[in-house]
Amino acid sequence: ALLDDWRQQYGSFGKARIARTNTRQIGSIFFGGGTPSLFKPQHLARLLEEVPHQGAEITLEVNPGTAEYHRFEDYQDAGINRLSLGAQSFSNAQLARLGRVHQQDETISAVAKARQAGFSNINLDIMWGLPGQSVAEALQDLRQAIQLQPQHISWYQLTIEPKTEFAGRPPIL
């Protein structure tokens, strides 16, 4: 029932937006903000039915620690053509400091599994300015991301948001 409500709201929003902008096609759709890969592929397919998206880049954000690799092919069948993997760092110590549920090897495995499933458009999210991270360590993370040869790398500075664990207990940078 919740999915049907979302689908109706998403479809109504998308159709209204397209009508206002006089655009016939959407160029990019991004399912992000946490762990949208926990959605079943058929649910994503139903959401995508609501808007014209032929030829669009459709991204699904995936946490390497919770990725269900057996679903990667099903995501493609649902219309997802780009995966964005939240690596954040290739240092297991940094990942632990950040409270991440994955380790470096899981990111490397997720990239390999995505390629095996047929994804040819992969993004890696990594961060710099992490607690105690040196410039050399940040650059090492970037080098490791480049070694995996993704089509895109998003290299973000750590941002401490209000009402998060780090806001109440800021890391020493």
Q: What kind of region is each of these model predictions?
A:
Residues A16-T23:
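Ala/Thr-enriched low-complexity intrinsically disordered regions
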Residues A1-G11, R24-L173:
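Conserved non-cysteine loop/helix-boundary elements of the Radical SAM core domain that shape
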